[in-house]
Amino acid sequence: EFSNFIEDPYITADIDREPFTDEVEVAIIGGGFGGLIAGARLSELGFEDIRIIEKGGDFGGTWYWNRYPGAACDTEAYIYLPLLEELDYVPSQKYAHAPEILSHSKNIAEKYGLYENACLQTEVTGMRWDALASRWVIQTNRQDRFKAKFVIMSNGPLHRPKLPGIEGINSFNGHTFHTSRWDYEYTDGDSNGALEGLRDKRVAIIGTGATAVQC
């Protein structure tokens, strides 16, 4: 009954492709900074057959999902953003905002050719070791069943919204959404604000952490 809280509101078009049944040298599960750095460094070492499997519609990890108004990183950009020298990039602010971080993620993937063999909008549903073939067999929700010589687990915990255990949450009739799935169709505006859709609304924010303060 809470499936709407985990749907991806940022996908503009569903990916239509045939299931993969091939073999790759390296499979990386997760397209956030961990997966991107792994893919980049492997590429620098000469690995060419790299496939990143990412549930979201693009690279970025937590910065793909968290696009709420005011979202920013509380660590200095020169420390937080990876591969700055490799991309010859200078952050625009001391504390980068979410759109810039997401853009940097995509630029990393572009530079290292990680889009070419990626499985976006794809979730791993199973993985087992084939001892006879000495390969991992990976299955996904898109009916993929391919093999990999090496697997790097780079999936984080922040892609799934944490709902509060409040009595009556499942029967509330007002409009609700999680900050990691911000509903701009309802609020209008963008990450900079201008939420005209909320002008005449009474809004309750559940939580008092950094996300609540920023948005």
Predicted regions and their residues:
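Rossmann-like nucleotide/phosphate-binding core characteristic of flavoprotein oxidoreductases
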Residues: E1-E25, L45-D49
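Short, flexible hinge/linker loops that cap or flank conserved catalytic cores
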Residues: E18-T21, R145, G197
